[in-house]
């Protein structure tokens, strides 16, 4: 019997965020599944990622990445009018500038979203295993 379980990874440092980035590399994201809630300072990203933790298995996992304490969000080369466009998440990068962190979500075709925050508080939470 396979031990299948859903993961929850919490990142509070740049090193932790690199683990989430590696887990979500090549994940598929619909524009309609990207939400920024400025009054709550939360940025949500629902995605379909490959189960990289199990090398014998290539199941997809429906997951959500939650970024908290986000002061602002900017996107480039993403047409937000067409909600059905499918993006491919390549990596999540971070660097510090003027006592604030800039978290950049890098997508294929030179598309990206930049989030600004004072603290790193990111959660990757699996919702459902696909192809069971």
Task: Give the location of each predicted region.
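Surface-exposed, interaction-prone regions used to assemble/regulate multi-protein complexes
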Residues: 1-132
């Amino acid at each position: 019997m396979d031990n299948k379980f859903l993961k929850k990874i919490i990142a509070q440092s740049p090193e932790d965020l690199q683990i989430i980035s590696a887990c979500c590399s090549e994940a598929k994201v619909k524009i309609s599944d990207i939400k920024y809630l400025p009054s709550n300072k939360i940025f949500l990203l629902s995605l379909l990622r490959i189960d990289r933790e199990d090398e014998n298995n290539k199941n997809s996992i429906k997951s959500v990445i939650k970024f908290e304490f986000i002061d602002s969000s900017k996107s480039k080369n993403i047409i937000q009018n067409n909600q059905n466009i499918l993006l491919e998440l390549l990596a999540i990068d971070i660097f510090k500038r003027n006592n604030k962190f800039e978290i950049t979500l890098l997508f294929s075709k030179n598309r990206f979203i930049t989030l600004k925050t004072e603290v790193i508080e990111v959660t990757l939470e699996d919702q459902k295993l696909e192809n069971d």
